Swiss-Prot record:
It comes from Arabidopsis thaliana (Mouse-ear cress). NCBIfam families: PPR. Pfam families: PPR, PPR_1, PPR_2, PPR_3. SUPFAM superfamilies: TPR-like (SSF48452). This is Pentatricopeptide repeat-containing protein At3g06920.
Length: 871
């Protein structure tokens, strides 16, 4: 039927569309108001269907375009409008006029529902006319007012699809809206489309574009637009110059702002107060206060009373520089010129005092300002924020009461400040009380209120209370957001309740709340930290599945998590995936990748990355140097490690005990003990305290060098410095003492370790058993051997051989033989010496059958070794 209407319409086009030109044909319906009312009553009182159609058909009126237009102007439901629009086509078998189509588009604009736009524009295109200028503007304007800029952009693109020419004002409205939300690329696309359509850009349009690009710091693009404007024979006006000064200055391009300032007079224009004030603000922000003062004095000299905004800017400049005496003096000068300082001027001073934490001085200024201006909401909020941060809650509540008397409280902004600051100072009960006291009729909590309280409660472990507040949020008119879910997930995981954390994520999906990249990154980080590396990997894939581009933090979390889980070898592949994607590394990302390379043995790659980091302007941190120094030390490239150590010191980086310990361990392992001692001495001179790893590294080096007496002195120093030995420490000493055959002394340390409640390692057990057996203390060795096995320990070959020899030397022939058989059953090698000692004992005790077995084993072992040598 729609196709029929289109065909018929085309046949009658000349009579209705003025030769296809896009003109609106005015229609009036002065005498038809009642008919329109009757139609609207039918459409608005019941559902659409055969009954509604029959009722409309029964109305005694002759269908006319005027009725369609009148009805569409009244309807607020786009679906009902389309149903009526189609019913009219079927009833009359006549095409709609341009004004009817435009009226339908205006219904879509009012409802912000453009689902049928493609179809309607297609019909209009076939009919040979398009949306009117006013309709086009209204559709875009409706989207802008509803903050649906992407939909507004899509409306324009759909018009272009059907070869319609979007209105000039539709483009400029959208460009202005995108400028306000810093979407400069969208602005530029629309601007280029305007040029393609032959629209002549104005200075005002160029001003909007230049401001947008400059605000985002895209200076080259902004300057390019400025050059394009000049090449279009358009002269910059004072507004454009003011925008350039302000925008370029705010992104730190002070010299460029000066250049624009000097260009003004060169081009025959005169700087106004906005020009001067903008330039003063730029200079103050750049800490060029002397130049700002000079400019303000020039302004003051040439104008009897500079504008209040100029005074406020200069006062803020003085305050930011901590020059409060000058700021107060300027207030007096302002008064002397007959200009009473405004509340904004005082708020500027209070803001600066807040940044510096000068609470008492701020309260004095607050009392002083009452002589000139009534404090406003911002004034009270600045002070309450300061007082809560400083822990002066009683004064903050007194100020809140003053606000109430002034009619400024309750208001949700003040409540949010107080709840947030109370949470951050861990005054959770007070924050909860304030939340509960909120009068929903006067002051309703918003998303910020809920977010602050949920996060505050969660951080101190009150996750169940946080969840209850979240449930209240679900019951309220506030929409949950990714910030709330991020906080809940993180805090549940941080307090050991990972299953609840997973449940929160599922709740979020069920609530149709889309996660953002920050939430997904946080969730992935939580899973890795909770020991769930496979789930962490899966979340990284989900990030991509949700059409997010993983950023530097995503990769950093993944690489760091895999390193901790023992998959450091995957760092290389992930790093190059990151590079191929064009992901820009920050310092944290560099540090994590460098650490990963070091841990998987790719120290050369780590070293190269350290150099790349420097060339790209990122300063290596103590973490960077620590990873590479440790990596080099572990592969005995100690001279290179020491050079990096010296480089870090030359850059005044505060080196920590971990870096010193890496070098001590490295030098100790290769026997360069004197250098290890020198580094330990430097560590202590720096005021650092050696940690357990430091002492264990040094002890291990001394034991390996068989300097056992020095090791014992070192052990004593360690205890004197209040560093408690652990099982590794005792294991090193026991092994060292056994190595130099001081078995009884080793056993003393063994007993000391047991008294401390430490569980010896397998190496400590086997070393001690072997040592006691070799020392002839076979009773203790045997008891220790049995206890070790009873606790699930598995003795090694050295342990069995030592026990067999010890029992043999103690003339316990059959006990020794039993262990000999046990050793054979376990498939462990038995030394020739052990066999000889056992054989001798068995012969002495007339255990001839057992001696024959041992002799046979000894012969077989000898043959095997001879064959191996021959081979």
């Amino acid at each position: 039927m729609v196709g029929f209407a289109r065909t018929k319409f085309c046949k009658n086009l000349s009579s209705l569309s003025d030769n296809g030109e896009n003109h609106e044909k005015p229609y009036t319906f002065e005498g038809n108001r009642q008919t329109v009312n009757d139609i609207c009553n039918v459409l608005e009182t019941g559902p659409w269907g055969p009954s509604a159609e029959n009722t409309l058909s029964a109305l005694s009126f002759k269908p006319q375009p005027e009725f369609v237009i009148g009805v569409l102007r009244r309807l607020k439901d786009v679906n009902r409008a389309i149903e009526y629009f189609r019913w009219y086509e079927r009833r009359t078998e006549l095409p709609h006029c341009p004004e009817s189509y435009n009226s339908l588009l205006l219904v879509m604009a009012r409802c912000r529902n453009f689902d049928a736009l493609d179809q309607i524009l297609g019909e209009m295109s076939v009919a040979g006319f398009g949306p009117s200028v006013n309709t086009c503007i209204e559709m875009v304007l409706g989207c802008v007012k509803a903050n649906k800029l992407r939909e507004g952009y899509d409306v324009v693109q759909m018009m272009r699809k059907f070869k319609f020419r979007p209105a000039f004002s539709a483009y400029t409205t959208l460009i202005g809206a995108f400028s306000a939300v810093n979407h400069s690329d969208m602005m530029l696309t629309l601007f280029q489309q305007m040029q393609e359509l032959g629209y002549e850009p104005t200075v005002h349009l160029f001003t909007t574009l230049i401001r947008g690009f400059a605000k985002e710091g895209r200076v080259d693009s902004a300057l390019s637009l400025l050059d394009e404007m000049k090449s279009s024979s358009l002269d910059a006006d004072i507004v454009l110059y003011n925008v350039c000064i302000d925008s370029f200055g705010k992104v730190g391009k002070v010299d460029m702002a000066w250049k624009f300032f000097h260009e003004i007079e060169a081009n025959g224009l005169k700087p106004d107060e906005v020009t001067y004030t903008s330039m003063i603000g730029v200079l103050c922000k750049a800490n060029r206060l002397d130049e700002a003062v000079e400019m303000f004095e020039h302004l003051e000299k040439n104008r009897r009373v500079p504008c209040t905004y100029a005074y406020n800017t200069m006062i803020m400049g003085y305050g930011s520089a901590g020059k409060f005496d000058e700021a107060y003096s300027l207030l007096e000068r302002q008064r002397a010129k007959g200009s009473i300082p405004s509340v904004i001027a005082y708020n500027c001073i209070l803001t600066c005092l807040r940044k510096m934490g000068k609470v008492d001085e701020a309260l004095k200024v607050f009392e002083e300002m009452k002589k000139d201006a009534a404090p406003n909401l911002s004034t009270y909020n600045i002070l309450i924020d300061m007082l809560c941060r400083a822990g002066k809650l009683d004064t903050a509540f007194e100020l809140r009461d003053s606000m109430q008397k002034a009619g400024l409280f309750p208001n949700v902004r003040t409540v949010n400040i107080m709840v947030d600051r109370l949470c951050k100072s861990q005054k959770l009960d007070e924050a909860c009380a304030m939340f509960e006291e909120m009068d929903y009729k006067v002051c309703t909590p918003d998303e910020i209120t809920f977010c602050s309280l949920i996060d505050g409660l969660g951080k101190v472990g009150r996750v169940d209370d946080a969840y209850k507040v979240y449930e209240k949020m679900l019951d309220s008119d506030c929409r949950t957001n990714s910030i709330v879910y991020t906080s809940l997930i993180k805090n549940f995981f941080n307090h050991g309740r990972k299953e609840d954390g997973h449940k929160i994520y599922k709740d979020m999906i069920n609530q149709n709340c889309s996660p953002d990249l920050q939430l997904l990154n946080t969730y992935m980080d939580c899973m890795f930290k909770a020991g769930e590396p496979e789930k962490g990997r899966a979340m990284f894939e989900e990030i991509k599945a949700r059409r997010f581009v993983p950023d530097a933090r995503s990769y950093s979390i993944l690489i760091h998590g895999l390193i901790k889980a023992g998959f450091a070898n995957e760092t290389y592949e992930l790093f190059y995936s990151m590079k191929e994607q064009g992901c820009v590394l920050d310092t944290r990302a560099y540090n994590i990748v460098i650490d990963g390379f070091c841990k998987c043995g790719k120290v050369n790659k780590a070293y190269q990355l350290l150099e790349e980091m420097k060339t790209k302007g990122f300063e290596p941190t103590v973490v960077t140097y620590g990873s590479v120094i440790d990596g080099l030390a572990k592969i005995d490239r100690l001279d290179e490690a020491y050079m990096l150590f010296e480089e870090a010191k030359s850059k005044r980086i505060e080196l920590n005990v971990v870096i010193y310990s890496s070098l001590i361990d490295g030098f100790g392992k290769v026997g360069r003990i004197d250098e290890a001692y020198l580094i330990l001495e430097e560590l202590m001179q720096k005021g650092l305290t050696p940690n357990l790893y430091t002492w264990n590294s040094l002890l291990d080096a001394l034991v390996k060098a068989e300097e056992i007496n020095e090791a014992l002195v070192c052990f004593q120093s360690m205890k004197e410095l209040k560093c408690t030995p652990n099982q590794v420490t005792y294991g090193i000493l026991i092994n060292g003492l056994c190595k130099v055959r001081k078995f009884n002394k080793a056993f003393v340390f063994w007993q000391e370790m047991q008294k401390q409640g430490m569980k010896p390692s397998t190496i400590s057990y086997t070393t001690m058993i072997s040592g006691l057996a070799k020392a002839g203390n076979i009773a203790e060795a045997g008891a220790l051997f049995d206890r070790f096995k009873a606790n699930g320990g598995v003795p090694d070959s050295a342990c069995y051989n030592a026990m067999i020899e010890g029992l043999s030397n103690g003339n316990r022939a059959m006990d020794a033989f039993s262990l000999f058989e046990e050793t054979r059953r376990r498939g462990l090698p038995i030394h020739n010496k052990t066999c000889v000692v056992l054989l001798d004992t068995l012969h002495k005790n007339d255990c001839l059958e057992q001696a024959a077995i041992v002799g046979a084993v000894l012969r077989e072992t000898g043959k095997a070794r001879h064959a191996a040598r021959s081979w």
